[in-house]
Amino acid sequence: MARPVVAIIGRPNVGKSTLVNRLCRSREAIVHDQPGVTRDRTYQDGYWGDREFKVVDTGGLVFDDDSEFLPEIREQASLALAEASVALVIVDGQQGLTAADESIAEWLRTQNCKTLLAVNKCESPEQGLGMAAEFWRLGLGEPHPISAIHGAGTAELLDQVLTFLPPKDEESDEEEPIQLSIIGRPNVGKSSLLNSICGETRAIVSPIRGTTRDTIDTRIERENRRWRLIDTAGIRRRRSVNYGPEFFGINRSFKAIERSDVCVLVIDALDGVTEQDQRLAGRIEEDGRACVVVVNKWDAVEKDSHTMTAMEKELRAKLYFLDWAPMLFTSALTGQRVDSIFALAALAVEQHRRRVSTSVVNEVLKEALSWRSPPTTRGGRQGRLYYGTQVASRPPSFTLFVNEPKLFGDTYRRYVERQIREGLGFDGTPVKLFWRGKQQRDAEKELVRQQNRQG
């Protein structure tokens, strides 16, 4: 079975996300002094002793508010409880017992999940005992005083959490999942796409821009592989965002790109490529991530048999940073071609991790040189490309040894990259070329050593 799940439940602004960051030793959950900052359920890896588990952070539960998101937040919490070994219920010791806490306790009794009660914001043991006493009235068992921000009482709380987890021998070793992030501007359909992929309401979907404010992690199996899907807050130009939860969510989205194996860049078919889409494309290429471009809302486009070809040409002209990325036209609403995302992403990841022998690299370079010689300067100096070798993967990176790097202009460098792609593939991944000066005799000796090392 997969690692056990611990669900974090409570009303808004009692410190759930702060506790998640404490339990998972991270800063991934957005923490801000505004109620309701976390709206979707988000997953992180938790560790205590020799045990590993998943911590799922849910949106703040409220039962006396008419916000349009509240039914969805309660549904997210129910889904989290359905997969959890224990629900860690968080209350605010400084504010004391509230009617909202009592409503949550009553609702929890209708759910089939064991509970553990933590009284947060107890900054000293003496203070904590007094604050915790009144929470016995909730009927959720012994209240445990803690301070999520300072760590007081959290060790004892985690010891209690472990007693609710299944025995360790019931867990199996898992291959590390492929990290796939869903990236795009607000309201291009990222959360709808995630829900279509998963077949459940995994992220709250609304026509209001910026509905998703955290990065949301989901584990799923497709194409005989395990995936960790990351739906991110919509990324806008920084000057249009005020400091607050949305600002922190945007920064989290950029971090999601950094920790991804492959990014799915979602473009709105009705809007086309915007300046912000171009910035995102550049960020993905700059960070060296594999990528699939998904053009969503294809069902809403009036089209004939030529529309897709014409639109792809137009989009690619503007997304020149990602001319190597496959492009897929989808509809999250109807599910059209959504399943194909995984096939393309799996291929992109495979190419992103691929390594090629030095002999094969140099066969391709020899062919490239036979078709087009390096440029010659006005003074009669000609560039000479001695040999190349792959020095890294993720992304594939090559060092090309030449007589003098400055003799090779951008045009010829792009030509060599195109020839490497045509000869070796690497669809769906950026390729990095490093041009290094070397004396011919030294280059020839180094090439022999490289070939002997690879057998």
UniProtKB/Swiss-Prot annotation:
CDD domains (UniProt xref): EngA1, EngA2
Keyword Nucleus: no
Signal peptide residue numbers: none
Sequence positions that bind GTP 2: 184-191, 231-235, 296-299
Taxonomic placement: Bacteria, Bacillati, Cyanobacteriota, Cyanophyceae, Synechococcales
Stated name of the protein: GTPase Der
Cysteine-cysteine disulfides: none
Quaternary structure annotation from Swiss-Prot or TrEMBL: Associates with the 50S ribosomal subunit.
UniProt-listed PROSITE patterns: G_ENGA (PS51712)
Gene Ontology molecular functions: GTP binding; ribosome binding
Function recorded in the entry: GTPase that plays an essential role in the late steps of ribosome biogenesis.
Binding site for GTP 1: 10-17, 57-61, 120-123
Annotated Pfam families: KH_dom-like (PF14714), MMR_HSR1 (PF01926)
Domain KH-like: 354-439
The keyword GTP-binding appears for this protein: yes
Sequence similarity: Belongs to the TRAFAC class TrmE-Era-EngA-EngB-Septin-like GTPase superfamily. EngA (Der) GTPase family.
EngA-type G domain segment(s): 4-169, 178-353
GO biological process: ribosome biogenesis
Keywords assigned: GTP-binding, Nucleotide-binding, Repeat, Ribosome biogenesis
